[in-house]
Swiss-Prot record:
GO terms for biological process: menaquinone biosynthetic process. SUPFAM superfamilies: DHS-like NAD/FAD-binding domain, Thiamin diphosphate-binding fold (THDP-binding). Keywords: Magnesium, Manganese, Menaquinone biosynthesis, Metal-binding, Thiamine pyrophosphate, Transferase. Homodimer. Belongs to the TPP enzyme family. MenD subfamily. Binds 1 thiamine pyrophosphate per subunit. HAMAP family: MenD (MF_01659). Catalyzes the thiamine diphosphate-dependent decarboxylation of 2-oxoglutarate and the subsequent addition of the resulting succinic semialdehyde-thiamine pyrophosphate anion to isochorismate to yield 2-succinyl-5-enolpyruvyl-6-hydroxy-3-cyclohexene-1-carboxylate (SEPHCHC). This is 2-succinyl-5-enolpyruvyl-6-hydroxy-3-cyclohexene-1-carboxylate synthase. PANTHER family: 2-SUCCINYL-5-ENOLPYRUVYL-6-HYDROXY-3-CYCLOHEXENE-1-CARBOXYLATE SYNTHASE, PROTEIN PHYLLO, CHLOROPLASTIC. Its EC number is 2.2.1.9. It is an enzyme of class 2 (transferase). It comes from Shewanella sp. (strain ANA-3). Its cofactor is Mg(2+); Mn(2+); thiamine diphosphate.
């Protein structure tokens, strides 16, 4: 084949891939610059059905795609060149696999004759993500390979997929056509003649039915299950599962609803949100130990006390509801797992429990904790928990909240206030890494342009500094709240043998501030050390059409000392 024909066929394959992915539900494509992925890049540049996002760093790009996929509830494509560019996606792919987020990696690659022979920027890319992505290896574009094969390969790999797919795309040079004119997928092309019908409509070449895995108990099984003292636990639930239905379920059965930070219900007035703290409240814990039935929605619970409660209790019946087959119980309890989303399961024909309202006293204990937190956090010294409660109390309607790992998400889980207007809440708690958090929040903010707040620790932000470049491109509010306690101060809560080891090998104080970093990327910046200034800056930032940074300066020991004091008060209640 002449070289010009090679470049044209490369581009045609790239266009077929991007067009079919758009038909399969992809709305966004995230792209990093590189030469070997040129056929994909040029095809994406002409693709009008996809919104394009560009970033120079593949690690941040992968996490941005993760955020876009979380917010859109749809697969997101990622285009990279060959070599370590692909490997830089690994952390985001791991997180996506563990949390069932569909990312589609399109990696440009050298042809077979340039692998393992010292050719530039050539590594073995197939299976680079090991167990964390479904692998598809495409051959180099060849006029003897029917275009239908390419489409059916994509359809089988991507349709109904809830986890990452890696599509490795080998290309021979030349990669750049001599000109870019007209439509890439020209219906007059002899190569595309078998696809005339496909070219005339907008549906995927192969149309798979939805793979529903709904399983549900019989009416008799439900009646027997609710006959006793039970609790309902809302773990990690996505907004599209409509977790609000669990409120009505709890009220109908007459069992308390205990909510995790990631349930979308942590601050709901009709739920028991302070479960982590109630489990160290003597009277509340004694009451909860009377339960012999549990209904768990989702998994990946934050609270170690709640995880321990599930492990230690002698359950007569343990049901767990998951949207797909998974194993999300580190205690390995014997249980019945039902496949359904939360709303589907909550809307079954439930009966009133024979022990309805058995735990109503929990509401009183929950209210006691509310008063304790108002006195000792809201009206106490300035600190991390106070800032998190202020954010949770002042969020406008339709806002999105992304809570960073390590200490921020735990403080929210322990101390978030009750509120009638709560934001859609996101986390990265699959692998719970502190990398890529800003990039993920940028992806969430970019999808629909809703006001978004990110609560992130200083070490997490240092991990993801260059994602400020993504943030500065946003045109809707993203408030980046950096809780700077000068190091990894979650280790203050862990039993490190002595303070010297804690300081030298775990906390890693850095003495850095973020003002110059914000200035480098031309982001509005404020540094605060009191609640009044924070609230003023926060409200102003929510009205700013773009990203801005608020750095909260606190001491290394403020949060850990406050947690210890609150734990003591709760235990003495």
């Amino acid at each position: 084949m002449r070289t010009e024909n090679t470049a044209t066929l490369n581009l045609m394959w790239g266009a077929l891939i991007l067009e079919e992915l758009a038909r399969l539900g992809v709305q966004h494509v995230c792209m990093a610059p590189g030469s070997r992925s040129t056929p994909l890049t040029l095809a994406a540049a002409q693709q009008t059905k996809l919104k394009r996002h560009l970033h120079f760093d593949e690690r941040g790009l992968g996490f941005m795609a993760l955020g876009l996929a979380k917010a859109s509830c749809a697969p997101v494509a990622i285009i990279t060149t060959s070599g370590t560019a692909v490997a830089n996606l690994y952390p985001a792919i791991v997180e996506a696999w563990l949390t069932h987020v569909p990312l589609i990696v399109l990696s440009g690659d050298r042809p077979p004759e340039l692998l393992g022979c010292g050719a530039n920027q050539a590594i073995v890319q197939p299976a680079i993500f090991a167990n964390y992505a479904q692998q598809v290896n495409l051959p180099t574009p060849d006029a003897h390979i029917a275009p239908q094969m390419l489409l059916t390969t994509l359809d089988e790999a991507v349709a109904n997929q809830t986890r990452p797919v890696h599509i490795n795309c080998m290309y021979r040079e030349p990669l750049y056509p001599s000109e870019m004119s007209g439509t890439i997928l020209d219906s007059e092309s002899p190569y595309l003649r078998p696809l005339q019908t496909w070219l005339q409509h907008a549906k995927p070449y192969t149309q798979y039915g939805k793979s529903e895995q709904l399983s549900s108990p019989s009416d008799d099984a439900i009646m027997r299950f609710v006959h006793g003292k039970g609790v309902i636990i809302a773990g990690t639930l996505t907004p599209e599962q409509d977790p609000q239905q669990l409120i009505a379920l709890s009220q109908k059965i007459g069992w308390p609803l205990l909510t995790d930070a990631q349930s979308q219900l942590r601050q709901h007035p009709a739920a028991i949100g302070n479960i982590d703290q109630l489990l160290q409240h003597p009277k509340a814990r004694n009451l909860l130990q009377e339960a012999d039935r549990v209904l768990v929605f989702g998994g990946r619970l934050l609270s170690k006390r709640l995880i321990a409660y599930l492990a230690e209790q002698n359950w007569h019946s343990y049901w767990q509801v998951l949207p797909q087959q998974d194993r999300l119980d580190p205690s390995h309890n014997a249980k019945h797992i039902w496949h359904a989303n939360a709303a589907q399961f909550a809307q079954l024909n439930w009966y009133r429990s024979s022990s309805a309202n058995w735990a109503n006293t929990l509401v009183t204990y929950n209210d006691e904790l509310h008063s304790l937190f108002v006195r000792n956090i809201d009206q106490g010294e300035f600190g991390e928990a106070q800032v998190i409660r202020a954010i949770a109390n002042t969020r406008p309607l339709e806002q999105q909240l992304f809570i960073g790992n390590s200490l921020p998400v735990r403080l929210y889980d322990m101390y978030a206030p009750v509120s009638c207007c709560t934001a859609t809440t996101y986390t990265n708690r699959g692998a719970s890494g502190i990398d890529g958090l800003l990039a993920t929040a940028c992806g969430i903010a970019a999808h629909q342009g809703k006001p978004t707040s990110l609560i992130i620790g200083d070490l997490s932000q240092l991990h993801d500094l260059n994602s400020f470049a993504i943030a500065r491109s946003l045109t809707s509010p993203l408030v980046i709240i950096i809780l700077n306690n000068d190091g990894g101060n979650i280790f203050n809560l862990l039993p490190v043998p002595n303070e010297e080891l804690r300081s030298d090998y775990y906390r890693l104080s850095h003495g850095l501030e973020f003002g110059y970093a914000a200035a480098m990327f031309n982001l509005p910046y404020n540094q605060v050390d009191n609640l009044a200034d924070f609230q003023s800056c926060y409200h102003e930032a929510l009205d700013y059409q773009g990203a801005s940074v608020i750095e909260v300066s606190v001491s290394q020991h403020q949060a850990s000392e406050q947690i210890a004091a609150l734990n003591l008060w709760v235990k003495q209640s």
